[in-house]
Each structure stands twice: as structure tokens, then as C-alpha cells.
Curated annotation (Swiss-Prot):
Compartments in which it is found: Cell membrane
Lineage top rank: taxon: Bacteria
GO MF terms, alphabetically ordered: metal ion binding; zinc ion transmembrane transporter activity
Protein name: Zinc transporter ZupT
Length: 285
């Protein structure tokens, strides 16, 4: 591990994980002040995030994991454990995705207009219902969404943290990529709560708290693993994190990017993300 025992690296890793989590609060602010989503920008940004995650996962993290494991366990065992860990990471995030309630699934990224339209449709369908019942239901939707996103963000926090321990060349682009994809999640939390309560501060608070599961995930992961952190642990974690990020990219970011813009815009964003990640890694050789 490159300076893994260096406390400065650990502090930087926590800071970057915290910044990625805070992006849900940015999404909340956008929901309050933006009446229309720039869908082309959203499309390119999500494609960019996917490009960063896929490139760094397959080119850097997987290879680093394999080197760590092969160096300790030998070629055959090291390669097998690397591959098993990669698909274990995919399985973990897929299970979390499966058991999150479908209607509050954070993978279904929505624009400001979509969330507001859904709420207006809901109110229209329930005109005869009492206002307090409708508001309570909207409040519940926002809270359940916040909890769903918090659960989903937990392994992402560990992913950001582990990548940050490997150095700035990995950490900064991944932090930016995860932050970009956290912004629409903040919108999904804050809009229903704001419509239910009329309180921007409360809506922002719930959005903010849902994002804090990322640094919490990092803290818990580091606390549990710090005493057994070695080349084997590092290799398994890096490979699993690579699997998590590939799944997020293919299951969430790319489909959503294509949904909100032209197919080619998503691909251009994807390629740009890969180029930025490649240059970032080359600069730190």
C-alpha cells in the first residue's frame, strides 16, 4: 500500500469521502433554485462519471489488486482471489440495489421537473384526501428515499476512501465522479420533503444526512480493517471496490445518461472521463 500507514493519507481519504457525500446537499440546493434541469449537461456529466469509474476500476484498481495478491499468494491463487473479489463487489452492490424499495431506488435518477411533476400528479389524484395525510405521505416518500440512498451510499463511501488511500491520482477523479452522481440523489430526497413541509432547511437536512452515510461507511470500514490492513486485505478491497464501481457505472450512470440526452453525448462524456482519468494516472507516474 502506498503510504497506507501515513496519517496524512488517511485524513485526506476521509476529507475526500466527506466531500463526495456533501454533493447530495448540492443537489438539494439545485432543487430549490433551478426550475429546469440542463439535460444535456446532466447527460455528459453522468457519462463522464461512468468513464472515470470504469477506466480506473479496470486499468488501475483491478491491476493494483492483482499485484498485491499475487505478490503474497502466488500467481494462481492471487489471480483467482482478485477475480472472486471483483465479482463479490458486484454481488454486494447488486444485492443492496435489489433490496432497496423500487419506488425509492436511488438508481432511478430523476430531474427536478420529474420529481415535481410526480408530486403534482400525486396531489391531483388525491384531491379528495386530507391535506395532512397527503403531506405525511410525501414526507414518508422523502424519508424512505433518504434512507434508501444512505444504504446505497455506504459502500460507495468505502470505495472512495480505499481509492483515496492509494493516492491523489486515483482519489480526486473518483471523488468528482461519485459527487456528480450524488447530486441528482439529493434532488430526489429534498423535493418531496420540501413539498410536504414547506421547510427548505428540513429538506436540506435530510438530503445532507443521506449523503453522510458515505463518510460513515469510510469510518466504519477503516475502524474494522485498520488492524488487519495488509497486502491481502488491500488487494481484496481494491478488487471489490472496482466491481462496485463498474456495476454502478453500467447499471446507473450510463443508462441514465442516455435517458437524458442523445446517445452520442453520453458516449462523449464516457470517453472524456476515461481520458481525464488516464492523464491523471500518467501525471503521477
Amino acid at each position: 500500500m502506498k503510504g497506507g500507514d501515513n496519517m496524512n493519507n488517511v485524513l485526506m481519504a476521509f476529507l475526500l469521502t466527506l466531500l463526495a457525500g456533501l454533493a447530495t446537499g448540492i443537489g438539494s440546493c439545485i432543487a430549490f433554485f433551478a426550475k429546469k434541469t440542463n439535460k444535456k449537461f446532466l447527460c455528459v456529466s453522468l457519462g463522464f462519471s461512468a468513464g472515470v469509474m470504469i477506466y480506473v476500476s479496470m486499468i488501475e484498481m483491478f491491476q493494483t489488486a492483482k499485484e498485491s495478491l499475487v505478490g503474497v499468494m502466488g500467481i494462481k491463487a492471487g489471480n483467482w482471489i482478485t477475480v472472486i473479489s471483483f465479482f463479490a463487489g458486484i454481488a454486494i452492490i447488486a444485492l443492496i440495489d435489489k433490496f432497496v424499495p423500487e419506488e425509492e431506488n436511488p438508481h432511478e435518477v430523476r430531474s427536478v421537473e420529474e420529481v415535481e411533476n410526480e408530486i403534482e400528479e400525486y396531489k391531483g389524484e388525491n384531491k379528495e384526501g386530507k391535506a395532512d395525510i397527503k403531506d405525511k405521505t410525501l414526507m414518508r416518500t422523502g424519508i424512505v428515499t433518504a434512507l434508501a440512498i444512505a444504504i446505497h451510499n455506504f459502500p460507495e463511501g468505502l470505495a472512495t476512501f480505499v481509492s483515496a488511500l492509494e493516492g491523489a491520482s486515483l482519489a480526486i477523479p473518483i471523488t468528482i465522479a461519485i459527487a456528480i452522481h450524488n447530486i441528482p440523489e439529493g434532488i430526489s430526497v429534498s423535493v418531496p420533503i420540501f413539498y410536504a413541509t414547506g421547510d427548505k432547511k428540513k429538506a436540506f437536512l435530510y438530503s445532507f444526512l443521506s449523503g453522510m452515510s458515505e463518510p460513515i461507511g469510510a469510518i466504519i470500514g477503516y475502524t474494522l480493517l485498520r488492524n488487519i490492513f495488509n497486502d491481502i486485505t488491500l488487494g481484496i478491497l481494491l478488487s471489490a471496490v472496482a466491481g462496485i464501481m463498474v456495476f454502478i457505472s453500467l447499471d446507473e450512470l450510463l443508462p441514465t445518461a442516455r435517458k437524458y440526452g442523445e446517445h452520442h453525448l453520453a458516449i462523449y462524456g464516457l470517453i472524456a472521463g476515461m481520458v481525464v482519468m488516464a492523464v491523471s494516472l500518467l501525471l503521477f507516474i
